[in-house]
Amino acid sequence: MTSMLEIYSGCRACSYDYLSVLYEQYFRKNGIEAKYVGTLVRPTDSQKFLIDDILHGSHELMRQRKKVDFFRGDSVLYPWYDFHIDSILIVPSNWNAEQYSKYFRKTYVLPHFVNDDAVEMIVRNEERLKEDKLRNIQYSFLTIGHNNDFDRKGIVLAKRLMDRLGISNKLVCYSNEPFCHKEHRLTEVGKYREYYRAKFYVSLSYSESFGMTPFEAMAVGTPVIYPNCHAYAEYFKGEVGLPINCQGHSIMRIGDKDYNVWYFDIDEAKEIIQYADSMSDEEYIDMSIKTFEFAKQFYARNIIPKLIEIMKS
């Protein structure tokens, strides 16, 4: 049995590839030898820390009859699907834990990490933010996300809202959607630079579990426009950024999958986007600094202690 902790990803075409690299960095910073290997392709005799789609990974684990020490999941769930895996499950929010925990030995809630090395290359402190943020803004709104099955990440919705308001030229998006500027293949540093260049990050997901975390944008002082429900309400509590009230929760069947989704007021979303677009420089900088401080304190108080607890387990 090797002492090397191998980190696996289930998808190189989306955020899991980036997240796998981040786990490797955080483990090494805390004195644990770790290596990002790639996609899960065959059993090995080493320890495994799997970052993967909850269902695809479950099928693969059962097919190969293997046990992993840590299993990372943040996707949809088949409510009728019956399985049990003798592993620790790590999910990014209680929103996920409510759906998945009964299938695993133990469940931890741990939001995805911010790449602090990349953040420090862009903005080190509040004073730097005050001096540089406004003059570095190149566009008003940014959204990033790989859409699948339906507009789960809110990429199409963001575009439609901007179209209705006549400001679609102010939205920059990185996604697999054909109207977007680029497929999401940003490097870590490149991704944070894009966050910093945006005045606001638009995150209108119907069922967000923080697969691509809005904390990344917040870490460089970019406020988030978001629906105040599911994981957003859990972590932000409407205290930061520009929240949109949610109207209710439902189950959406797309093909053979059931998605837990929330609905929010589209008219209110338009009003908030208009308000953000017309915000004064003084008000914006105040919000940017509050966003930056919120993200920094949240990670210091919640993420790092929980990460250490999980590693000790």
Swiss-Prot record:
EC number: 2.4.-.-
Keyword Transport: no
Gene3D superfamilies in UniProt: Glycogen Phosphorylase B (3.40.50.2000)
Keyword Nucleotidyltransferase part of the UniProt annotation: no
Keywords: Glycosyltransferase, Transferase
InterPro entries for the chain: Glyco_trans_1 (IPR001296)
Protein name: Putative glycosyltransferase ORF313
Taxonomic classification: Viruses, Adnaviria, Zilligvirae, Taleaviricota, Tokiviricetes
